[in-house]
Amino acid sequence: MPRGKSKSAGKVNNMGDMIKRLNKKYGMEVAHDLNKENPTEVKGWIPTGSRWLDSIICKGQKAGIPIGKISEIAGLSATGKSYMAACIAAEAQKQDIYVVYFDSESAIDPAFLSKAGINTDPNHFMYIQAITVEQVLEMIEEFLGAEQRILFIWDSIANTPTDSDKEGGFNPNASVGKKARTLSLAFQKLTIPLANAECTLLCLNQL
């Protein structure tokens, strides 16, 4: 019996070392001890500013959008998507979460942000013009190395062209499906790094 216990303990130690080795090799937390942490557990929530909406999203819990995840606000044009995103940003700042706002429509101004309760000081907020889909995604990936909880707001996906759209002409068929493929790959690539960094991506889209 004592030998069995010793052998079992050795295996646990070896696997503990393996977790460290894997995480070091891949440069991020990919292997976990579920007795210590659950990587799929939501670390926190950012309220939307509407307790009624929060309770619907979270099945009765007054929460909001999940930290470390990718969320989307979709709706028709001029239905208040940007204002809701701004309200979420203001709530995020209350939790000491930095806000990065990607604007593809050049429609956001400081007065609008202040009305929603956002602190636009550069120590708390950064405004970036969304030139192309690829540039936005590359910048998000770069921000993830900042060791800072960040809320990324992308306003909006629909109005952000791809690199090929920007460089090409005005033929809508020239790059059919390129944006969808790029976003699909990017979201797969960003899902785990966002969760590990406790950063949140809120995408706005038009129906």
Where are the regions that the model predicts?
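Conserved P-loop NTPase nucleotide-binding/switch module
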Residues: L151-N196, C203-L207
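Amphipathic alpha-helical transducer elements in NTP-driven molecular machines
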Residues: V12-M15, I46-S50, D54, I67, ...
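Intrinsically disordered, low-complexity linker/loop segments enriched in Gly/Pro
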Residues: Q93, F102, F125, I157-A158, ...
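The Walker A/P-loop phosphate-binding site
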Residues: R3, K7-P122, I140-G145
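Switch/connector loops and helix/strand junctions flanking conserved nucleotide-binding motifs
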Residues: I108-F112, Q135-L137, T160-S164
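Loop/turn-to-beta-strand initiation segments
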Residues: D96-Y98, N123, Q148-L151, N196-C203
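Short amphipathic alpha-helices and their capping/turn segments at secondary-structure boundaries
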Residues: L137-F152, L190-T191
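Conserved P-loop NTPase mechanochemical-coupling segment
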Residues: T120-A130
